[in-house]
């Protein structure tokens, strides 16, 4: 009986500790605004697999145009600026009062005061490609302030704004869709077929069994109501 009691206590303590360790993170839902002045429409989402990396932000369409105004998503100050021929092209990093960083990339131009500062630093450093640490307080921004104009610079395949939210100081990328941005989600997924795998075998040792499905109102069901023996 004593052993059983000790065992139950250990289970309870382990469960309680695990619950405290894996508490859900609640991200602010109202502090960040749409960085553009048009409704958000995505051409690429967070976490998509690319040839050699994961896509760590949102690609927001700019109606196949450049030079749309880009706005600060929240209060803070510009603390880094990047200019490079590939990658982000021209980019702005804003550190916010709430402990996050936002990144705006593939910009066509900076707002005039910022552009003058970048040009001055480029001449001082005698190089075009720069990654500048901007002194804190030199370029404070308020939510909605104009900071740049959208573009197609760097490693971009078409006009858009690449937008990221990161955690400071770890510089960890977070999914911007966790922060309550007004992103329409009105296209339900289309299910074409059901694939069944044998869990006792490796995925590399088998091909799935496919079963046709049909739409039935707001859900899908098997096209043939048959009992399958797997």
What kind of region is each of these model predictions?
Residues 4-13:
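Sec-dependent N-terminal signal peptides
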Residues 18-91, 95-101, 110, 128-130, ...:
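Surface-exposed, glycine-biased beta-strand/turn segments
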Residues 96, 165-167:
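Residue-level signal for short segments within beta-strands and strand-turn junctions
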Residues 104:
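A cross-family detector of function-defining hotspots
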Residues 115-133:
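Intrinsically disordered, low-complexity Ser/Thr- and acidic-rich flexible linkers and loops
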Residues 158-165:
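Histidine-centered catalytic micro-motifs
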């Amino acid at each position: 009986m004593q052993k059983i009691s000790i065992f139950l206590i250990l289970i309870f303590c382990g469960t309680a500790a695990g619950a405290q360790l894996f508490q859900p993170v609640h991200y602010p839902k109202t502090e960040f605004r749409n960085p553009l002045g048009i409704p958000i429409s995505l051409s690429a989402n967070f976490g998509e697999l690319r040839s050699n990396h994961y896509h760590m932000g949102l690609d927001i369409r700019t109606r196949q145009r450049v030079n749309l105004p880009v706005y600060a998503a929240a209060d803070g100050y510009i603390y880094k600026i990047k200019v490079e021929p590939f990658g982000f092209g021209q980019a702005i990093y804003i550190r916010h009062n709430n402990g996050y960083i936002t990144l705006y990339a593939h910009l066509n131009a900076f707002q005039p005061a910022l552009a003058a500062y970048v040009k001055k630093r480029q001449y001082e450093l005698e190089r075009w490609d720069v990654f500048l640490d901007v002194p804190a307080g030199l370029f404070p921004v308020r939510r909605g302030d104009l900071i740049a104009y959208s573009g197609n610079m760097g490693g971009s395949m078409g006009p858009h704004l690449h937008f990221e939210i990161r955690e400071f100081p770890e510089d960890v990328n977070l999914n911007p869709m966790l922060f309550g941005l007004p992103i329409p989600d009105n296209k339900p997924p289309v299910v074409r077929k059901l694939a069944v795998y044998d869990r006792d075998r490796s995925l590399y040792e088998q091909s799935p069994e496919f079963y046709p499905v049909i739409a039935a109102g707001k859900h899908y069901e098997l096209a043939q109501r048959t009992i399958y023996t797997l």
